[in-house]
Amino acid sequence: MTTPRARAYLARIGIDEPVARTVDGLERLQRAHLTRVPFENLDVYAGREVRTDIGWSVPKIVDRGRGGWCYELNGAFAWLLGELGFGVKQLGATVLLPPASTEFEHLALEVALERRYLVDVGFGDSFIRPLPLDDAGPHDGGSGPYRFEFSGEDTTLVFDGPDGPEPQYRFGTGTFGADDFVEQSERKRRDPQQKWRQSPFATRLLDGGPDRVTLLHDRLKLRRNGEWSEQPVQPGDEWDRALRQWFDLVP
């Protein structure tokens, strides 16, 4: 039976009926989360507290209506999936996109059904459906082609973009918990040289994707039918209005 807290979380992402423990049900949850809960750095940019534990992340998302970064979004989503009866494993990943990354700075999820799937609701403009981990691919990620490269116990997620392969992140077989990401979270939120502290942003899917809206510090970007458009946004009141209009958030 779904708990009241899990039902409140489902309502937050726009789901008001039971979700089957199948890959289709998992995809529905992933797309709903990516649509309703933005990937954003507003608290980090403002110098406010953020934490990695679900005692922080679930209330932030469900009660305060905010988004967050990978530790909050994937940590909370892992809790929800567990409440719904999915088998979930938290992975520590090394981001391979520039700038250079430190080891295990990203939290991603492995979900076990009839196959093992990689799931992520905290990596910005990335795949939007579960990717089977027992098959190198390529796979239709809902937003483009993705595949895996296997080397020993390590797996690398690769996006096959129009300009060639783009390695996204690498992860192993270990299981991670919220405490394992505290040091990384604190370092990134406190260091003024980190990109997370440089300028605010928010991004989410539109209507389950792959259409997307992204608000950067000086412009609003929209992807519709595979084509991007953008318009300038002035910092201050205009930026705050765009944040409210597209994300129902205040800074």
Spans of features found by a protein language model:
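Catalytic Cys-His active-site segments of thiol-dependent hydrolases/isopeptidases
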Residues: 117-124
